[in-house]
């Protein structure tokens, strides 16, 4: 009786071990990357930079757990995407504008202007240095006190009532208000001090304002109620970004006055601008998910991205400035309205800056270019600004600008 030996298939233990190894590797990579991502979101100063690098490394590590050149090529190329995004995130994190923090109650809502500083208050303003990829904000860029008078205007120096040569009004945004500076370092304050008290200065500028608040303050009688001595000069400190604000093409509105222009050129106010809804809300995302995504500088940039301005927006802005000049001239005959124009702070504003220069000249409004007043400002503005990450004018810039204003007035 012969015994037939049947060849049994090879034990599955070897095959199982061959499959278990890659599967275990891939599972380990996925789980460890997920845990690392959660820890980064919880504790890291720039979580999405590290999170993206983690997943780039995970995809490249997964190449050792798959067979075949095509799967490996796909994983390699997929890993490039988060790696590139990590580079963008790193750049934005280290160059992102850091907002100031104000003491409670410093700003209050206003139906006309949108927001105003509280009257008769001393408010503290602080600004942290930018965060790094390896550290949270280290120290502060500035820690200053803003003194507001009984009219809600930034503190002005004493003036000689018996030898008063005139009153000078200032309008504008944080550049004229004096962001990050002590009271006596602002442009209006320096004009008063350097004149020896012969000129009284009134600073109607406020952080975030633009031409629309200047017009609203004049049209609604806010300026008229404050000014009790005939002003001889009015200076509007302008920036190209004011065009975006006047057209409502910024992510924040804060109930700012909204002006529109009719087909016949008539300018009128039509309600107010309000804040744009957060990107997560617009996309219908869960608030918790939106909060986590907001830890990404890329996400914040997308949510805060300003629309492009058009030639119509520039015309609207120039019309607002012109109307402001006309109302001041009607209320204070003989007043001289002038513009101090800062150059573009962002390359995207370059064309707008040039059109504003041409527009002011075309309207016959005297304009002083900061790039001409502050020597070397265009090529190297470092000595005239607060820091590399904050281009607001420093005390030196305002002292030189004040000298320019007084020379213009003396002519």
Where are these regions (language model features)?
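Short, intrinsically disordered terminal tails adjacent to the first/last structured region
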Residues: 1-20
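Histidine-centered active-site loop/cap adjacent to the catalytic His
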Residues: 3, 20-21, 387-411
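Membrane-embedded alpha-helical segments of integral membrane proteins
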Residues: 22-63
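Internal/C-terminal transmembrane anchor helices
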Residues: 69-95
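Membrane/wall-proximal cationic-aromatic binding patches
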Residues: 96-194, 374-378, 384, 388, ...
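Interaction-surface signature
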Residues: 98-113, 117, 211-308
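Extended hydrophobic/aromatic segments used for targeting, binding, or gating
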Residues: 192, 197, 202-207, 212, ...
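Conserved, well-ordered alpha-helix/loop/beta-strand core segments that scaffold catalytic motifs
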Residues: 232-243, 297-377
């Amino acid at each position: 009786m012969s015994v037939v030996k049947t060849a049994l298939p090879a034990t599955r233990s070897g095959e199982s071990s061959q499959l278990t190894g890659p599967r275990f590797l891939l599972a380990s990579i996925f789980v460890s990357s997920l845990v690392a991502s959660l820890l980064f979101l919880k504790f890291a100063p720039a979580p999405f930079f590290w999170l993206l690098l983690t997943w780039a490394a995970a995809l490249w590590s997964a190449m050792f757990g798959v067979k075949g050149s095509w799967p490996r090529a796909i994983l390699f190329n997929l890993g490039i995407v988060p790696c590139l995004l990590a580079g963008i995130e790193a750049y934005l994190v280290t160059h992102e504008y850091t907002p100031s923090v104000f003491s409670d109650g410093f700003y209050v809502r206003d139906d006309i202007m949108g927001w105003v500083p509280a009257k008769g208050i001393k408010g503290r303003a602080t600004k942290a240095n930018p965060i790094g990829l390896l550290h949270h904000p280290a120290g502060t860029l500035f820690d200053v006190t803003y003194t507001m008078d009984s009219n809600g205007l930034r503190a002005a120096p004493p003036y000689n009532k018996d030898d008063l040569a005139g009153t000078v009004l200032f309008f504008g945004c944080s550049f004229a208000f004096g962001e990050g500076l002590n009271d006596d370092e602002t442009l209006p304050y320096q004009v008063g001090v350097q004149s020896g008290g012969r000129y009284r200065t009134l600073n109607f500028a406020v952080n975030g304002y633009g031409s629309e608040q200047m017009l609203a303050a004049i049209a609604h009688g806010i300026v008229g109620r404050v000014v009790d001595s005939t002003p001889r000069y009015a200076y509007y400190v302008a920036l190209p970004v004011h065009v975006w604000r006047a057209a409502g093409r910024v992510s924040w509105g804060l109930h700012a006055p909204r002006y529109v222009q009719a087909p016949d050129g008539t300018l009128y106010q039509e309600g107010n601008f309000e804040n744009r809804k957060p990107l997560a809300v617009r996309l219908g995302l869960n608030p918790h998910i939106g909060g986590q995504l907001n830890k990404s500088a890329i996400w914040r940039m997308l949510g805060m991205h300003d629309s492009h301005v058009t030639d119509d927006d520039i015309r609207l802005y120039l019309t607002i400035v012109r109307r402001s000049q006309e109302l001041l001239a009607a209320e204070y005959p003989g007043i001289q309205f002038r513009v101090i124009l800062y150059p573009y702070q962002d390359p995207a504003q370059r064309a707008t800056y040039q059109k504003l220069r041409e527009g002011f000249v075309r309207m016959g409004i005297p304009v002083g270019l900061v790039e001409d007043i502050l020597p070397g400002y265009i090529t190297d503005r470092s000595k005239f600004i607060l820091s590399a990450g904050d281009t607001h004018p420093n005390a030196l810039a305002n002292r030189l600008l004040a000298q320019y204003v007084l020379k213009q007035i003396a002519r």
